[in-house]
């Protein structure tokens, strides 16, 4: 379809999704891209997934000294820009959507524009996350503002339509001078995550009481606070804690859990295919993260019928999911989190009632089908707006 044309406005689109790692469901950004690709196809669109691990448009890994080693601990790889592969993947496409602002994504946008194809981009990498991975650099005044500026300079200034997964990150972009058209669209959750059967009214609190958390085992996800809170709980001996993820703090968290927790615990990687069953087997979801653009793991837990207890942090959008005060605690406050955990254990009927409420709310507001329809509307708007200039 010609740029700016409104002809065949409702026809299926050919969309190229450009993501560094396209075959890794353990990485949040890749997981989102794979979910969107699957749902786009289900809705009748043609998707060309371009990236490392893609079966149709595979890209080689780009090795950056030290940086790649650190990124690998977060299940993240950098893709090597490949103009020839981009031209092959983009031929006949209606629009190109890029997920990350690195050299690979920049070349994808440049190639698309050279071919007369509009490009959009998602803002999935929070600068605060980058700084937490960089250790003491996060304490440098103005460091996060510089990264917001740098990302805009690197990629987003060449893009008019930007997908932001939450209102929080959209507000951050506005505060840091982004003047583009921002589309707040949740990443959504897979329909594989269905609600568990809640316990009958009057049933006692389960023993063991299973608490689950999911996320990278890194400092900004603050699983340290969760472990300390479980240790402080009046029901500590009855709690079974599962933390799903991999990352640089895995060994440290295991040592801490072994020292502090009297009950059973498990910390480590869980295959994405096993997550729906695991979540339905648990009783409470805790999300202690300090930094989050949205948090897919909270959506998946709520869709599974779990009540969430979420850290309230100015750098995290996850708190938006809380429907009552008992689902919130102040970030990095293990005593307050322990109180929240104890309240839910002491009120099993409320736990069941709110579990059903959270499941229904999530199904209505955050289904992948509705999110992808909004995404397609953004892409159609970008196609109509495109004037062929870089």
Predicted segments — roles?
Residues 307-311:
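Short hydrophobic beta-strand element within catalytic cores of glycosyltransferases
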Residues 323-335, 343-348:
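Conserved acidic donor-binding segment of nucleotide-sugar-dependent glycosyltransferases
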Residues 16, 202-232, 242:
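Conserved donor-binding/catalytic core segment of Leloir-type glycosyltransferases
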Residues 114, 126, 143-161, 176:
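Membrane-proximal helix-turn-helix segments that form the acceptor-binding/catalytic region
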Residues 101, 290:
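Aromatic "clamp/platform" in nucleotide-sugar-dependent glycosyltransferases that forms part
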Residues 90, 269-270, 277-282:
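Short alpha-helical donor nucleotide-sugar binding micro-motif in glycosyltransferases
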Residues 168, 188:
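Carbohydrate-associated surface elements
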